[in-house]
C-alpha cells in the first residue's frame, strides 16, 4: 500500500487587507497543508471584488510550501437554499451560487462545498428535484472545472442531504458528473444517526461505494459532536471532547479509502482568559501524531 498522504487543514479567515494571501499565512501557522475559506461573509451576499484577493501572492506562498492548490476548498454561503419553496429565492440562490463558483475558479480552487438546503414545507422529492435542477441549469450556463461538493447534513429542521438515498438522487440526476461530489461531515453524520465506530464506518463506506461511488467523496469535514448520535442538532466539538471520540475520528482521517482526500477541521475556538483562541494548531498536531492530549486543560494550567 502506498504511504498515506495526509491532507489536513481547517477553516481559515479571509479578510482585508491580505485576503486570500492572509488565509494561506493563517493555515501555515497551524501547520496545515490545506485550508477552507468563504469568499465573503457566509450569512449575506456582500462581496469584495475578487481582484483584491492577492491571489498571485497566495499562489506563490502555496508553491513555496509545496501545497497543492487542488486540495484547497471554498465553502458556499449558508444563505443559499437550492430547494426553497419560493421560486424567486431559488433564482437568487442560483445566481449567487454561479458567482461563488466563478470566484472559486478565479482563485484557482477546484472544490466548493454546498449545503443542499432545507425543504421547509415542501415534499422531499420536490426539494431534491429542485436541487439537481438548479445544478443542471448552472452547469449548462457556465463552463467550469469546479466541483460542487454536497455536504452531508445533520437533519436539523427540514434539511436534506442527510442520507445516501437523498445524495444518490441528486447525483444521479446531475448531468455533468465531473462537477458534482460529496463532502462528508463527521459531526453532521453522527447527529443524523450514522454510527462512526470502526466497523460501522467501514460498512458506511461500502454502502456509499455501492450506491454512489467512493470517488465522489472529494472532501471531509472533521469535527467531534456535542450531541448524542441521532440528535439532529449540528453542534461541533473539539476533537476528543465529544461523542464521536478521537480514536474514531483518527480511523476516519486515516482510512485507506480516503487517502489523498482533503480533511478540514471546523471545530470551535476555545474561550480562554477573556479571549477566544483557535485550537487548530494543536488539533492538527494530534492528528499527525495520532495521539490525543487534553489541550484545554494544558492551556488552563499554563503548560503547553
Curated annotation (Swiss-Prot):
SS bond partners: none
Enzyme nomenclature, EC number: 3.1.21.2
GO biological process: base-excision repair
Gene3D superfamilies named in the record: Divalent-metal-dependent TIM barrel enzymes (3.20.20.150)
Cofactor annotation comment: Binds 3 Zn(2+) ions.
Amino acids binding Zn(2+) 3: 188, 234, 236
Cofactor(s) the record lists: Zn(2+)
Family stated for the protein in its record: Belongs to the AP endonuclease 2 family.
Catalytic activity reported: Endonucleolytic cleavage to 5'-phosphooligonucleotide end-products
Protein name per the record: Probable endonuclease 4
Function: Endonuclease IV plays a role in DNA repair. It cleaves phosphodiester bonds at apurinic or apyrimidinic (AP) sites, generating a 3'-hydroxyl group and a 5'-terminal sugar phosphate.
SUPFAM superfamilies: Xylose isomerase-like
Binding site residues for Zn(2+) 2: 151, 185, 221, 266
Binding site for Zn(2+) 1: 75, 115, 151
Keywords: DNA damage, DNA repair, Endonuclease, Hydrolase, Metal-binding, Nuclease, Zinc
GO molecular function terms listed in the Swiss-Prot or TrEMBL record: deoxyribonuclease IV (phage-T4-induced) activity; DNA binding; DNA-(apurinic or apyrimidinic site) endonuclease activity; phosphoric diester hydrolase activity; zinc ion binding
